C-alpha cells in the first residue's frame, strides 16, 4: 500500500477554530484519539527474521504474511501503536487476580471500582513507513506503508526476536475527521516526564506529559491510503483529492508536502 499526505502547522490559538471548521467541512464531530507509540530500531540485517515466535502464534496467516514482508524488507525504525484512553493516564496498574478476587468480596455499596490500566491486555499494531519517494512530480508526500496486528501485552519479546530493539516511546493526542477518502488528523506529540528503557506498564497523569512543541502548536495531517501504488491513475486521483482539500482549507492553514528527510525511517 501507499500513503499520500499533506501537512500543516497549526498554532495553539487556532486549534479550537480549526476543529469547528473541520467539523463543518466533514459533517461529523471530531473523534478524539490518544495513542501510545513505541519506537523500535532494527539491529539485524534483512532476511534473518522469523516472525513465528512466542505469542505471534495466535496471529492469522494474513497478518503473519504482512509482518514477514515488513520485517524482512530492510533495516528501519518502526512504530508499535496502541490506543489508550484519558482514564488510562495516571491510573494504577491492573491488580493481579488474587487482588481482584479480594476486592470482589468488599461491600457492594462502596464507591465505583477504580479504573486500572491493564498493560497485559493492551492491543498493539505494527506500523511500517518507508522513507518518502524522491523526485515525485506531484506536490504531495508519497511513501510505502503497511500495518499488522500484534499480540496484546508486552511486545518487546517478539520484537526482540524479530531483530528490533526498543528505543523510546511517546504519546499522540488529537482528533480524527473523515472527508470522503481522506483521513484528517489534527494532533500533537506528547513526551513522558522521564525516559524509560522499556515500554511503560503504568502511564503518568496526562497533565504531566509535555508537548513536543512547547508553544502548544498542533500538526494537521491529511492522508489517503492507496492499495495499489503502481496504478498511476489511482495515485493521480488521490493527489487531486488532497489538492481539493488544500484549496478548501487555504484560508485557515497551508497544507504542503513534508520535507522528505524529516520522515526518513531508515536505521543507520
Swiss-Prot record:
Decide whether keyword NAD is in the record: no
Give the record's keywords alphabetically: Activator, Nucleus, Transcription, Transcription regulation
Q: Where is this region: Disordered?
A: 91-112
Q: Which GO terms describe its biological process?
A: positive regulation of transcription initiation by RNA polymerase II
GO terms under cellular component: core mediator complex; mediator complex
Where are stretches of biased composition, namely Basic and acidic residues?
Answer: 99-112
What GO molecular functions are on record for this protein? transcription coregulator activity
Residue spans making up a coiled coil are none
Q: Where in the cell is it found?
A: Nucleus
**Main location group:** nucleus
Which Gene3D superfamilies does its entry note?
Hypothetical Protein Pfu-838710-001 (2.40.320.10)
State the family named in the UniProt similarity comment for this chain. Belongs to the Mediator complex subunit 18 family.
Q: What does this protein do?
A: Component of the Mediator complex, a coactivator involved in the regulated transcription of nearly all RNA polymerase II-dependent genes. Mediator functions as a bridge to convey information from gene-specific regulatory proteins to the basal RNA polymerase II transcription machinery. Mediator is recruited to promoters by direct interactions with regulatory proteins and serves as a scaffold for the assembly of a functional preinitiation complex with RNA polymerase II and the general transcription factors.
What is its quaternary makeup? Component of the Mediator complex.
What name does UniProt use for this protein? Mediator of RNA polymerase II transcription subunit 18
- Its source organism is Aspergillus fumigatus (strain ATCC MYA-4609 / CBS 101355 / FGSC A1100 / Af293) (Neosartorya fumigata)
Species classification:
Eukaryota, Fungi, Dikarya, Ascomycota, Pezizomycotina
Q: Which gene produces this protein?
A: srb5
